Amino acid sequence: MIAGLDIKELVELALLLIAVGALSGFLAGVFGIGGGAILVPVFYECFRIAGVPLDVRMPLCVGTSLAVIIPTSIRSFQAHYKRGAVDMTILRVWWLPIVIGVVAGSVIARYAPERLFKIVFVAVAYSASARLIFGRDSWTLGDDLPQGPLMRIYGFCVGILSTLMGIGGGLFSNLLMTFYGRPIHQAVATSSALAVLISIPGALGYIYAGWPAAATYPGVSALQIPFALGYVSLIGAVLVMPMSLVTAPLGVRAAHAMSKRTLEVAFGCYLFLVGSRFVMSLAGGQ
């Protein structure tokens, strides 16, 4: 037995993570997200079953999710870039404030209580769910993205919130760009590039933030802290990454070939369910 699990249970967990990798990669391509909205709740359940201590469980999920997003987002960005759909002007304005936001989020992760990660995830999941399910073309903030300080503030907020949630930023940047009248396909493509900017420094930040936690739990068994770099689980990342790389280009192909309304509603419902799961976790302390 490993981490209190028999071989059958370990195999089931491994197969679940592989399947989730395929789904997260596909969604990374379709929505321009890194897949963290799928990965974080599944990692949470897997780490709970494996007996990871509650104090480090949520940040370990977030850090591992950001690590998985690195290759997935790069693959997705390359596919969108080849189609000429990425708005490089937005990237030039946003890259620095996003990176600063990621660094700030990583510092918060080192000292924040575990509940904070869940609260941020719930708030954003519910907001994005409402936008995806009930959103209308008339829901706008302006005819085009703002210039000057407000645009950079948006970038900073995307960076810090994405880092605390363990996502690639696509949920935020998609919402912002479409609220300002940008075509959904351009928003998706540009978001895939932002996920690269967020995931690399974000994962490194969680490795740094989680280093003290690894020393705090020296007796935790094999599937848990010893097979992690800080708040990044190597086992979780290795199981999820390969399939996510395979399916990301398939998601890009689907994004440019189909109506997104059905997928938007389905994903919005999923986010609502995930948010509700973490609400119950906050209430019950599990």
Regions found by a protein language model. Give the residues of each.
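Juxtamembrane transmembrane-helix boundary motif
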Residues: 1-31, 38-59, 73-165, 175-186, ...
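A structural-propensity feature for long, helix-poor, extended segments
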Residues: 65-72
